[in-house]
Amino acid sequence: FIMGMSKKQWDRLNKDKKQPLYNRFRQVWCPGSTFKPVIAAIGLQSEAFTGTDNFGNEGHSWQKDKTWGTYHVTTLHTYSPVILKNALIYSDNIYFAKAALKIGTEEMERSLSMLGFHSSIPFEIMMAESKFSNNKHIQSEVGLADTGYGQGQVLVNPLHLACIYTSFCNDGNVLKPYLLYKENAKAEQWISEAFSKSVSQEVLEGIKSVVNDSHGTGYAIHRKDMILAGKTGTAEIK
């Protein structure tokens, strides 16, 4: 800790465009592709699709129909078959846009609300609330599709997203975060049975492949001495 600073130093920090004093971990951010495992779990849990359903190869650009005007969902890779595990490996925007449409607006809003969106996180430090829409309702079909790959109006607190990911390795239960180390601590559940054991296991296998499959977007952190799981994510501004 420092004992103080000059006014010149303080002004320089406050005027820095990179905002070094901004408490980023408490805020919400566009999750981008890190949101895809969440959509996968919602889709499987709601039986909107199965992990073996082939969504079809659309190339690098897709729109549902002409009512979308000039708007297209784009992706970087083509592959076959277009099933859930491969969609996670290649981080396919088009697959997850289609997945969101299959889930539907009502189920998407219900499931995300159940996962703690538009609600406070049970944590010692107050965090900004994650949200799937500016007004708690997904307004359009394009907005729903964009939600599927972590864009649209979706904003997520990083701690909240990490909590949801705990469900994939805890039989579908979302664990409660805590700040201070506890000796021999036992995990506390925040959201019990958010997903079934089979759904959480299927998503876990998918995000293991993201890291351990040579085509996976997270293969750079692959290790031979342990099995890692995760999901890459890059948000974009269109």
Q: Predicted regions: what is each one?
A:
Residues 1-33, 38-238:
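Beta-lactam-recognizing serine transpeptidase/beta-lactamase-like catalytic domain environment
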